[in-house]
């Protein structure tokens, strides 16, 4: 049998319970470039916590004015009048040198500067009210420490107890250096990291846990954030998640959708007043802030207004836009997002009909047009999960990574740190997977027992029916995957209702994945089984790919048989 080594994400059942309760209060953290969230599991339910200002989505922003440091929503308010002293989008700068800085999203705040080869921000602060303002360098590491410390304080205020650690989700594209830098910043902030889990794993875990459904499936997780988008194809089998492929675009997200509205309204304002508000930093900041609100309203309604007092040269601005016009204006950006999903499926060497479920996560995924684009890519049997789909998400797409991290935190919070570290060691996480299905023939159909991408070792038990007479002969095959195409003829057109220019519809092609037996790898024969008896067949594959098969009549009559491949 052919095997391949693939990174698999272990669930908490892989861990061993420690005698001590080293971590009693463990939270889940989603640390985004633009927003962050905190989640905690209490009495079996994981919820996103609100900070002292009542915000569940906490802006990842720091701003400085005089001797004051502002954080979150208060800091976001400073972007209009104090942008040069505000620090944003610093998460993805962690673990990078200034030479590695090829793209950043700090266009409307303090720009990154070179700090002895590292990335930092130049701000002006006062130590107290009586001292003179002076320049200070705040590195991306220091900004992350301060932000994470504020999140920890908010969690402790809400829970009324000290937080002992966290599980944090990170993008698949994060390098080892970025992961280590994030852990370092969290530790310095007084928030020990028990485990870093990938964003798509957190998304799936949030939904699987809330719905208490654990079935084998192949899932596309399309995470459209504020500044970046990441799409992953994930195999979920036997409680293990394996990322089969992942692609990302570091310049595609909600900000590009906001830009669409900014340009739309700016052109309208310029046409009426002869002034382009985009040429003035403060006017642009005010318009962007309003467009963020307008964008959110369009996610739920068909029309949204935009109003900015004194947008430029003392002139007020009032306008509106409907969703149809917005979708048209944003079509290029939305199509890029859809193309990223297609690219991920192709990278996994799959077809759209191989995908069981598509989950749209992240704030930008609230755009209803994205859901309709997914419905045009995938067949009807693929379940689309979004805030506006036929099978809607029961959770806020912006909170899925935080909730998934909170779920994992509740599952491993009382485990020993050494056991957690051992369970995520490369030898445990990088495990072999099947590259071809294994199963048996049942009549004219092939029944897959172990599907492609099953993590090894694996064990399954199935039931087969003995023939009416004679010995039970059970061949076990390694199969090859193929595509079955069924053509469905269109319904005939009623001649009385048909128009002369009506074109005859083409037959619809329905594609489905099938497995065809190719290589016989084992045979089980029960010579003296009762006619039509139920036979319990147990197949087990070890980490080296060796198959062991055993069979026994469930009525106890006959001989038990056991064998294995070489």
Swiss-Prot record:
The keyword Cell division does not apply. Belongs to the heat shock protein 70 family. Keywords: ATP-binding, Nucleotide-binding, Phosphoprotein. Pfam families: HSP70. This is Heat shock protein 70 homolog C57A7.12. The modification Phosphoserine is found at residues 86, 500. ATP binds at residues 39-46. One of its GO terms (cellular component) is plasma membrane. Signal peptide: none annotated. The lineage of its organism: Eukaryota, Fungi, Dikarya, Ascomycota, Taphrinomycotina. It comes from Schizosaccharomyces pombe (strain 972 / ATCC 24843) (Fission yeast).
């Amino acid at each position: 049998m052919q095997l391949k080594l693939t990174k698999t994400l272990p669930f908490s059942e892989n861990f061993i319970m420690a005698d001590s309760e080293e971590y009693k209060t463990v939270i889940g953290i989603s640390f985004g470039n633009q927003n962050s969230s905190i989640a905690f599991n209490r009495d079996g339910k994981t919820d996103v916590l609100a900070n002292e200002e009542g915000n569940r989505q906490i802006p990842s922003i720091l701003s400085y004015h005089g001797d004051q440091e502002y954080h979150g929503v208060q800091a976001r308010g400073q972007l209009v009048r104090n942008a040069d002293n505000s620090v944003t989008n610093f998460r993805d700068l962690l673990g990078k040198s200034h030479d590695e800085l090829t793209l950043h999203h700090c266009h409307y705040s303090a720009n990154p500067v070179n700090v002895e080869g590292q990335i930092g921000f130049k701000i002006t602060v006062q130590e107290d009210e009586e001292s003179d303002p002076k320049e200070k360098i705040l590195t991306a590491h220091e900004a992350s420490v301060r932000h994470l410390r504020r999140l920890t304080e908010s969690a402790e205020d809400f829970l009324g107890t000290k937080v002992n650690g966290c599980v944090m989700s990170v993008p698949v594209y994060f390098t080892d250096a970025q992961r280590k830098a994030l852990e370092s910043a969290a530790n310095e902030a007084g928030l020990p990291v028990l485990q870093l889990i990938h964003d798509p794993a957190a998304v799936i875990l949030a939904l699987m846990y809330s719905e208490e459904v654990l079935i084998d499936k192949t899932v596309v997780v399309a995470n459209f954030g504020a500044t970046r988008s990441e799409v992953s194809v994930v195999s979920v089998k036997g409680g293990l998640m394996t990322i089969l492929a992942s692609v990302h675009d570091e310049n595609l997200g909600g900000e590009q959708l906001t830009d669409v509205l900014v340009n739309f309204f700016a052109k309208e304002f310029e046409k009426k007043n002869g002034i382009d508000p985009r040429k003035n930093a403060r006017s642009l900041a005010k318009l962007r802030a309003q467009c963020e609100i307008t964008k959110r309203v369009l996610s739920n309604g068909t029309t949204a207004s935009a109003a900015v007092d004194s947008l430029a040269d003392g002139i007020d601005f009032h306008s509106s836009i409907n969703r149809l016009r917005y979708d048209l204006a944003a079509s290029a950006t939305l199509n890029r997002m859809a193309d990223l999903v297609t690219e991920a499926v192709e990278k996994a060497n799959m077809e759209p009909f191989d995908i069981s479920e598509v989950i749209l996560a992240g704030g930008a995924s609230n755009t209803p047009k994205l859901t309709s684009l997914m419905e045009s890519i995938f067949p009807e049997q693929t379940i689309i999960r979004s805030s506006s789909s036929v099978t809607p998400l029961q959770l806020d797409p912006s909170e899925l990574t935080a909730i998934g991290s909170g779920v994992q935190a509740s599952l491993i919070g009382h485990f020993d740190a050494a056991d957690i570290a051992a369970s995520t060691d490369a030898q445990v996480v990088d495990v072999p997977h099947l590259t071809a299905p294994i199963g048996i023939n049942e009549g004219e159909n092939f029944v897959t027992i172990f599907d492609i991408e099953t993590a090894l070792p694996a064990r399954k038990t199935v039931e087969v029916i003995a023939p009416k007479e004679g010995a039970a002969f059970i061949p076990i095959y390694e199969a090859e995957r193929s595509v079955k195409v069924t053509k469905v003829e269109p319904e005939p057109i009623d001649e009385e209702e048909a128009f002369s220019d009506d074109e005859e519809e083409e037959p619809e092609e329905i594609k489905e994945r099938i497995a065809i037996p190719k290589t016989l790898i084992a045979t089980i024969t029960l010579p003296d089984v009762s006619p039509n008896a139920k036979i319990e067949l147990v197949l087990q594959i070890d980490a080296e790919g060796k198959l062991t098969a055993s069979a026994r009549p469930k009525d106890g009559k006959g001989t038990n048989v056991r064998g294995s491949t070489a």
